[in-house]
Swiss-Prot record:
Species of the source: Chlamydia pneumoniae
EC assignment: 3.6.4.-
Function, in words: DNA-dependent ATPase involved in processing of recombination intermediates, plays a role in repairing DNA breaks. Stimulates the branch migration of RecA-mediated strand transfer reactions, allowing the 3' invading strand to extend heteroduplex DNA faster. Binds ssDNA in the presence of ADP but not other nucleotides, has ATPase activity that is stimulated by ssDNA and various branched DNA structures, but inhibited by SSB. Does not have RecA's homology-searching function.
ZnF bounds (C4-type): 11-28
Protein name (record): DNA repair protein RadA
One Pfam entry name: Zn_ribbon_LapB
PROSITE patterns according to UniProt: RECA_2
This protein's UniProt keywords: ATP-binding, DNA damage, DNA repair, DNA-binding, Hydrolase, Metal-binding, Nucleotide-binding, Stress response, Zinc, Zinc-finger
Family indicated by similarity: Belongs to the RecA family. RadA subfamily.
């Protein structure tokens, strides 16, 4: 009698499983995200005995050449000082944002250092990929294109070519023929990534994987996909703008939350040497409702413009909208502004926007957001050319922020003359900054509002 094929229902967002179909995923609570997949049968007679033995940590010798430098300052920095041999890097982003372009340029830089690159172009033909390479002036003989989606054929090509670098474009199109599910399904993405990880670690092949993202901006596929790889990078930005951002959210071999800003040109992507200047280049002069705040992105500071608009509301329920700023935190801050500084906003529509399409979550932008709102409401400017730094507590107090010196140095570099900051942190700054940079300390949000009046 033939054995019955077992199936299970797996969430295509988080990878959670259930024995039967459910309308809502029990893991991530998304609706209609469970799909049916076959459960692979365990092989009979397999042994659980390990083929390796434990190794003393002190006896392991590290190679000095364990990292490969891409010869691109920004790329090497965001990867923690070059890419580690045998590592698996996942690059996720929206369609058409430039993921393939970026990795083709990366392949060219690595090939120029005599590394052999295998580029698996599963989504495009060889002709389409070569046309893009020609536009980017890429013609290295050490870059090999392989238009294939079958994992078995890819593994055979890897064994034949023995590349140093492997690029998969993209993971959602590659399939394992031993599984009875469609390419891009939870089971396929999980198993294909696992096998690529095994190949990368055993053969010391540095691997880059391109992944699609969902509507919410997360990499499509099971959450285990991000756990399997060594580095997760998000490629962000507006496809209608000429700049892109790469943000590291996971890195086993370096720091996380690093940010790399690139500009799109006819011949590919190039690093922006002065990111603060990029986001402030269209600011013509002092404007009510506008504040400049320094935020920390990875190991560097970045100046951005925060704009607020306050107008009378014709409706009983005023509108509160944000772009690039957490709306829940903004509602909380407006409540603090009304309660602690007696700024009446209950009949006003309030809008807040981060210019350039950036998204910020750090609390050091609190004070800048509230001063921008007050500036728009009272139609008053800050008296000096200053940046604004500070977290606002529920009691209206201005709280300390991290990396204050780094933020102020970035403001000084960009030509600003002073800063509004927590009063209690002024004494911790170096003497040079205290003497050569105008510092205005504030204890409460009410003190900060007085600077406008």
């Amino acid at each position: 009698m033939a054995t019955k094929t077992k199936t299970q229902w797996t969430c295509n967002q988080c990878g959670a499983t259930a024995p039967k179909w459910l309308g809502q995923c029990p893991g991530c609570h998304n609706w209609n995200s469970l799909v049916e997949e076959y459960v692979p049968q365990a092989r009979s007679g397999t042994s659980s005995r390990s083929s390796t033995s434990a190794i003393a940590l002190s006896s392991i010798e590290l190679e000095n050449e364990s990292r490969i430098f891409i010869d691109h300052a920004g790329w090497d920095r965001i990867l923690g000082g070059g890419v580690v041999r045998g590592s698996l890097t996942l690059l996720g982003g929206d369609p058409g944002i430039g993921k393939s372009t970026l990795l083709l340029q990366t392949a060219e830089r690595l090939a120029s250092q005599k590394y052999k690159v295998l580029y698996v172009c599963g989504e495009e033909s060889v002709t389409q990929t070569s046309l893009r390479a020609k536009r980017l002036n890429i013609s290295s003989p050490l870059i090999y294109l392989f238009p294939e989606t079958n994992l078995d054929n890819i593994k055979q090509q890897i064994a034949t070519l023995e590349p140093d670098i492997l690029i998969i474009d993209s993971i959602q199109i590659i399939f394992n023929p031993t599984l009875n599910s469609a390419p891009g399904s939870v089971a396929q993405v999980r198993e294909v990534t696992y096998e690529l990880m095994q190949i990368a670690k055993s053969a010391q092949i540095t691997t880059f994987i391109i992944g699609h993202v969902t509507k919410s901006g997360e990499i499509a596929g099971p959450r285990v996909l991000e756990h399997l790889v060594d580095t997760v990078l998000y490629f962000e930005g507006n496809s209608h703008a000429n700049y892109r951002m790469i943000r590291s959210v996971k890195n086993r071999f370096g720091p996380t939350n690093e940010l790399l800003i690139l500009s799109m040109h006819a011949d590919g992507l190039k690093e922006v040497s002065n990111p603060s200047g990029l986001f402030l280049q269209e600011k013509t002069g002092p404007t009510t409702g506008s504040m400049i705040i320094p935020i920390i992105e990875g190991s560097g500071a970045l100046l951005i413009e925060l704009q607020a608009l306050v107008s009378s509301s014709p409706f009983a329920n005023p509108v509160r909208k944000t772009a690039g700023f957490d709306p829940n935190r903004f509602s909380l801050l407006l409540a603090v502004l009304e309660k602690r500084a007696q700024v009446k906003l209950f009949t006003m529509d309030v809008f807040l926007s981060i210019t350039g399409g950036l998204k910020i979550i750090e609390p050091a932008a609190d004070l800048g957001a509230l001063l921008a709102v007050a500036s728009s409401l009272y139609n008053r400017l800050l008296p000096n050319n200053s940046i604004v730094i500070g977290e606002v507590g529920l009691g209206g107090e201005i709280r300390h922020v991290a990396h204050l010196e780094r933020r102020i140095k970035e403001g000084k570099l960009m030509g600003f003359e002073g800063a509004i900051l927590p009063e209690g942190q002024i004494s911790s700054l170096p003497k040079e900054i205290r003497e050569n940079f105008r510092l205005q300390g504030v204890k409460t949000i009410k003190d900060a509002i007085r600077l406008l009046l």
